[in-house]
Amino acid sequence: MKQSKWTLLWLALLPCCVWSQDQIPQTAQADQLQTSVDSLRRYGHLADPVALTDFPVPANFRHVQENVISDPDNALAPFWQKLAESQTHAISDSVRIVHVGDSHVRGHVFPLTAGDVLHQSFQSLSYVDDGINGATSLTFTTPQRVAEIVEMRPDMLILSFGTNESHGKGYNESRHYVQMSDLYQLLRESLPDVPILLTTPPGSYERGGTRRRRSYTINPRTKLAVSNILKFASEHQLAVWNLYEIFGGADRACLNWTGAGLMRPDHVHYLPEGYALQGQWLSQAIIKAFNAYVESD
């Protein structure tokens, strides 16, 4: 890949891209913006669209789909509204995204890249991540974990799970659905009005062979977990960013990533360049959705 400012970004983040668990980031303090007494709604204009940056994929990528957030029920509208008003200082609060998930989030490069891109367009926006190695949605289904999320004061909550649920051969779709439901209900008790964006896992392999001669095959359960996440999103009127399908789906996602040399030797985790690309595309999808909201006003 050609060196760019994004390559420099993940190089700077590389020391923190480790798999060991450390303390959950402390709650960030809200930034203060210039206060405006008038809402832009009063003048019939919300905010201007934001310029989009093109983030090209490696040449070997095939079957890449349109990079969009699916939100047929406009579940994210309250977040777009607040973000638009913060753009013109119609409100004095900062806007915060909290990204919760497994080791893909825990490695920091994925969420920090997304946050860096977004902050360049939205000066009021802060992006906080909370990832745990080996996590599933069940990992966060405790009063303590939810309380920690609440303390971060999210205006939008991103949930990124599915890799670990689907990694074992004992994957059960019904159990996975119940675990998603349990976490969702617990979050809704404490954060009833916070919009939630689900993401799907990027894809992984499962290991076979012997200790001397390892072999890897595409994990066939990833597509089942993805379908389950999409079903849950539809039945609970939640927005979803389908990372798996966007980068090639069952036919090409894993082949695209490995073909570009962007996966680690374990064939589950990604190199910093791979996570950086995922973060860039997540931020691009968020900006597209924001632009669609303000342009429809």
Feature locations, PLM:
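Catalytic His-Asp segment of secreted/periplasmic serine-dependent ester chemistry enzymes
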Residues: G203-D297
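Conserved SGNH/GDSL esterase-like catalytic core that processes O-acyl groups on lipids
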Residues: S94-V194, Y205
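Alpha/beta-hydrolase-fold catalytic nucleophile elbow
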Residues: S160, T199-T200
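Ser/Thr-glycine-rich phosphate-binding loops at phosphate-binding pockets of nucleotides
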Residues: S103-H104, T200, L271
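N-terminal secretory targeting modules
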Residues: M1-V100, H104-S124, M152-R153, N291-D297
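Extracytoplasmic/secreted proteins, especially bacterial periplasmic and envelope-associated proteins
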Residues: N74, P78, V109, T113, ...
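Alpha-helical scaffolding within the catalytic cores
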Residues: D71-S86, L138-E151, V178-L186, K223-S227, ...
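Proline-centered loop/turn at the N-terminus of a beta-strand
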Residues: V194-L197, A239
